[in-house]
Amino acid sequence: MRGFRFPLLLLFCCGLLFTLSSAPVAAQSSKVKLDSTDGFEIVNGKAGMATYRGQKAVHLMPLAGHELTDGSVFAILKGTDFKDGAIEVDLAGAPRPGADPSMKGFIGIAFRVQSHAEVSEMFYLRPSNGRAPEQLTRNHSAQYVSDPDFTWQRLRTETPGKYESYVDLEPGVWTKIRIEVAGAKARLYVNGASQPCLIVNDLKRGESRGQVALWSHETTEAYFANLKIE
């Protein structure tokens, strides 16, 4: 039996080495320093730096003449290649002065962005709905969409209530969101909650990949800070 000790020890060590080498490696966290707009591709708008409620932030704005029109502004983070993982950001959105009452301060994060924002998955918030006096309006506070085919109108018509939900929000107030993505599933967390406010188990583009982008509506005063990608 003494002659088997070394082979057994060698076998054990080899097995341990294989186990460690084949174990999944934890995703590394990457904090994006938002002290300049140089690292973004801006689509359908413009971006600048501002100090908002004590935080240095990226300020997304519509192009001149589009301040009250119905369109999207994207700030695509150059060099990102996101498939699975997590995205965190602090954001603050409120309707621009003079905006129609139906405009709710739409603001959010797009992921797996392709073709200069023609294609994307997205979670966004409607801050003005968060404390509305009617429950049905509150239930439209958080939204998932998938451009270009699955707009909020289509999703609400075909599957009412499945891709939007209530979450407590205030317009113009810093709000932390976290998006966790795995395969064709994604979850949205707000303000450090341990449970998601919105769960999507069938992302419309399946297991795709692409860039990460800040997003706002043209009628929104939109600010972003403390972006982190894991």
Language-model regions: role of each:
Residues 1-6:
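N-terminal secretory signal peptides that target proteins for export/translocation
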Residues 7-21:
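Bacterial N-terminal signal peptides
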Residues 26-230:
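Extracellular glycan-recognition regions
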